[in-house]
Amino acid sequence: MKKGLFITVEGGEGAGKTTIINLVQEQLATQGYEVIRTREPGGVELAEQIRDLLLHTQGVEMDNRTEALLYAAARREHLIKKIVPALAEGALVLCDRYIDSSLVYQGHARGIGMEEVRAINGFAIETYMPDLTLYFDVEPEIGLERVQKDAVRSWNRLDQETLTFHKRVQEGYKKLLKAEPERIKAIDANRSFAEVFHDTMEEINRMLLSTKD
């Protein structure tokens, strides 16, 4: 069976992930890679429906554990219906968020506990972990200011969280970065998109070079 490559992109709100992923997808295609771009929560029909529950339900308070379980359920659907088949075909999967988001947002920032959330997601993803995770590190104040200025962005539940919550998100990502420096690479996302894109491609090309026979 052919084995593809699995790259995930992580970061707090306003880190610029979507913009950079667009550029990365185009660049990798010019380098001859079959790129399957996807996102979490979402990526397949049922997971997109769960996404709407998680991010776009207004006026309904959601229990933190319910939230964590819904993210894991969406991830399972996405994994088995889109990511695994693409990897089996030898594609390069480029995913906007994956398990690290749950560990950070629900595990650390919500206070459930990273290991508790890891256990939930271990059942969902089995052994499917990214070959490379790019963490776009943006200061929460800068990220939230970008979100407020983005006229195209649609509202989601995370936009109403406090600055303290978003600082805990950043703190959680840095804990993961310290624990898994081989897989997770930090990129300073406080800079221009051109600079962030340059460093992003450097990390990806370094990984691609290391995987060649």
Swiss-Prot record:
Q: Where in the sequence is the signal peptide annotated?
A: none
EC number in record = 2.7.4.9
Highest taxon, organism lineage: Bacteria
Any one of the GO CC terms: cytosol
User: What CDD domains would the database entry show?
Assistant: TMPK
**Keywords assigned by UniProt?**
ATP-binding, Kinase, Nucleotide biosynthesis, Nucleotide-binding, Transferase
PROSITE patterns per UniProt: THYMIDYLATE_KINASE (PS01331)
Which Pfam families does the UniProt record give? Thymidylate_kin
Keyword flag ATP-binding: yes
The catalytic activity, as recorded, is:
dTMP + ATP = dTDP + ADP
Binding site residues for ATP: G11, G12, E13, G14, A15, G16, K17, T18
User: What is this protein's function?
Assistant: Phosphorylation of dTMP to form dTDP in both de novo and salvage pathways of dTTP synthesis.
Q: What family is reported? A: Belongs to the thymidylate kinase family.
Its protein name is Thymidylate kinase
Species source reads Shouchella clausii (strain KSM-K16)
The gene is tmk
